[in-house]
Amino acid sequence: QEFIITARDLKQQKVFRESTIRSLFDEILRGLRIVHQHKMLHLDIKPANIFITDDNRSVLIDFGAAREVLSKEGNFIRPMYTPGFAAPEMYRRDAAMGPWTDIYAIGACIYACMQGYPPNEAPQRLEKDRIAIALSRLRGIYSDNLIEVVEWCMALDPLSRPQSVFALQKELSRESERRYTKLTMGEKVRLQFDTMVADTKKSVKGMPGLGTRQR
């Protein structure tokens, strides 16, 4: 999974400060709110589709999967989706999609900015959800408010998520929260180490003859 693109073509640190996350996604949500006001859904929000300009403004790109909201007749073509950032309802033919579907992806993007890697795919979460446990390890690094916002956005039940971009914007812009959390070197090393271990486990599991005990 490619990470957030920058106009300078520089590799950004995988882990973002809370103040940076709030600032970036405030701008992204402004653009997404306009999309939703035109009765459209993006449906492919992911870090690779977030472009950061030279003056550090964030822009949502690639509307190739964008579709109109369900009509009264229910005619709707299911778009392609990106595992980890696609909401559970995108995997089901009979599920209604709406602003809450894009909001799930926003939460997944914020999660990726905090952890340095994407969350588990929705079907995996439906079997065994580890999101809350993973986020709990970030308490003290990020504010409780930001962690709760991500959990809210990534609720498996669409009705348990913010139902509009405005509701999410309001919560994400709360001035009373600790917005300038800085990661210490030790915290950065720990997060990067955790990522390396997770990637190694995935690589070993995928190698023939490894990851399972031979008899």
Regions found by a protein language model. Name each.
Residues R161:
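Conserved HRD-motif arginine in the catalytic loop of eukaryotic-like protein kinases
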Residues I28-M40:
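Protein kinase catalytic-loop region centered on the HRD/HxD motif
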Residues L24-F25:
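Activation segment signature within eukaryotic-like protein kinase domains
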Residues I141-L156:
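Conserved C-terminal C-lobe helix
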Residues E89-W100:
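Conserved end of the kinase activation segment
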Residues N75-M90:
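Conserved activation segment of eukaryotic-like protein kinases, specifically the C-terminal portion
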